[in-house]
Amino acid sequence: MTDPLVRLEQITVAFDDRPVVDRVNLTVSRGDIVTIIGPNGAGKTTLIKTVLGIQRATSGQLSVAPGLVIGYVPQHLTLEPTLPLSVRRFMLLSGRTLADCTAALERTGVAHLLDASVHHLSGGEKQRLLLARALARKPDLLVLDEPAQGVDINGQATLYDLIRQLRDELHCGIIMISHDLHLVMAATDRVICLNQHVCCSGYPEDISQDPAFVETFGHQVAESLAVYHHHHNHRHNLHGDVVSSADAHEGCSHDHH
């Protein structure tokens, strides 16, 4: 197994002595697509901020690979509507060369919009622009916060497929937050169900049947997700380590009521 890009060990983030993220373990290596799901207020964004180094952990240990380059795609692109801003200018503000910016736009399929106004882009085009800006950094790790936000249903599957292709081409690791549970199950290698703590973690089709997942999201959601099937020759425990099938799930000791 390759050395991890990022490893979180027993990470806790508390505000006013109340844990928002509680003893979370997470390991991401090159080639991994790890999707974090959970209800609103589950601590997903706080966990991502910790990975990015924006939020300091109250306890636990965060380890990153030497020289790690992270490309971050935020959930929203909020700009002053009266500020004239072209795609070209927006990309160059990242500090990358025009050649790197253009190459990144080509990878995400929006190079033809180089001279367009950012304000006139559709939701899907904005997400591809944000993804291109992250790619221009030539990242080892991509962190995507709700990448399908504002994208119509017809474009969501295409966007997730692009993310998979980028993983294969760049051999980078990917951490993704998503509420689009149906598409997540078809687009990821490993799912972490977060509700302050890790409720369950592992192979997507197993997660949909895990009692902790069912309790968090309900039987109807779990049953609808079970139609997705992936075929892997390994499984992971809650720490992200490869284990035998019999040891794949450690369960959840937290009270979900």
From Swiss-Prot:
<dbReference type="Pfam" id="PF00005">
    <property type="entry name" value="ABC_tran"/>
</dbReference>
<keyword id="KW-0813">Transport</keyword>
<dbReference type="GO" id="GO:0016887">
    <property type="term" value="F:ATP hydrolysis activity"/>
</dbReference>
<comment type="subunit">
    <text>The complex is composed of two ATP-binding proteins (ZnuC), two transmembrane proteins (ZnuB) and a solute-binding protein (ZnuA).</text>
</comment>
<keyword id="KW-0862">Zinc</keyword>
<dbReference type="GO" id="GO:0005524">
    <property type="term" value="F:ATP binding"/>
</dbReference>
<keyword id="KW-0406">Ion transport</keyword>
<keyword id="KW-1278">Translocase</keyword>
<keyword id="KW-1003">Cell membrane</keyword>
<comment type="function">
    <text>Part of the ABC transporter complex ZnuABC involved in zinc import. Responsible for energy coupling to the transport system.</text>
</comment>
<dbReference type="GO" id="GO:0015633">
    <property type="term" value="F:ABC-type zinc transporter activity"/>
</dbReference>
<feature type="binding site">
    <location>
        <begin position="38"/>
        <end position="45"/>
    </location>
    <ligand>
        <name>ATP</name>
    </ligand>
</feature>
<dbReference type="GO" id="GO:0010043">
    <property type="term" value="P:response to zinc ion"/>
</dbReference>
<protein>
    <recommendedName>
        <fullName>Zinc import ATP-binding protein ZnuC</fullName>
        <ecNumber>7.2.2.20</ecNumber>
    </recommendedName>
</protein>
<dbReference type="InterPro" id="IPR003593">
    <property type="entry name" value="AAA+_ATPase"/>
</dbReference>
<comment type="similarity">
    <text>Belongs to the ABC transporter superfamily. Zinc importer (TC 3.A.1.15.5) family.</text>
</comment>
<keyword id="KW-0864">Zinc transport</keyword>
<keyword id="KW-0997">Cell inner membrane</keyword>
<keyword id="KW-0547">Nucleotide-binding</keyword>
<keyword id="KW-0472">Membrane</keyword>
<feature type="domain" description="ABC transporter">
    <location>
        <begin position="6"/>
        <end position="221"/>
    </location>
</feature>
<keyword id="KW-0067">ATP-binding</keyword>
<dbReference type="InterPro" id="IPR027417">
    <property type="entry name" value="P-loop_NTPase"/>
</dbReference>
<dbReference type="GO" id="GO:0005886">
    <property type="term" value="C:plasma membrane"/>
</dbReference>
<dbReference type="InterPro" id="IPR003439">
    <property type="entry name" value="ABC_transporter-like_ATP-bd"/>
</dbReference>
<dbReference type="InterPro" id="IPR050153">
    <property type="entry name" value="Metal_Ion_Import_ABC"/>
</dbReference>
<dbReference type="InterPro" id="IPR017871">
    <property type="entry name" value="ABC_transporter-like_CS"/>
</dbReference>
